[in-house]
């Protein structure tokens, strides 16, 4: 498979998508953060010094999704049509699982946007409770599904 972000002289480039037709595109990404019982309970009970952790993580995930093109060099600025976030509580493992769904009608996919949103949301949780638990583990950041575009659909 040819790398599309390199020109014929092996220099980096942003792919030209102007000849591609617009299609509806949706990507869902997820990731987890595992922590101590003390940190988990502080979040659940809204008893942290920095405020409402999960609500702030959702806002951060939305912002991260919107700002992906400013963080990942070869990502196109996109006109997103929607971003949804959901946080699953997994108390038996002191874990939160964050899902981000990004949507648009456009010429390129939104996988990187969904993945970036998840990453920023999880990092925000870490930042807000690191005073309680510095050993938190962020893991399993992954694409769950995508639809639309030339490469077709994907579902994990």
Swiss-Prot record:
Active-site residues, Swiss-Prot/TrEMBL: 127
Superkingdom field: Bacteria
EC number: 4.6.1.17
Keywords attached to this entry: Lyase, Molybdenum cofactor biosynthesis
InterPro entries registered for this protein in UniProt: MoaC (IPR023045), MoaC_bact/euk (IPR047594), MoaC_sf (IPR036522), Mopterin_CF_biosynth-C_dom (IPR002820)
Residues at which substrate binds: 74-76, 112-113
Gene3D superfamilies referenced in this protein's UniProt entry, alphabetically: Molybdopterin cofactor biosynthesis C (MoaC) domain
Record family assignment: Belongs to the MoaC family.
Subunit note: Homohexamer; trimer of dimers.
Name of the protein: Cyclic pyranopterin monophosphate synthase
This protein's encoding gene: moaC
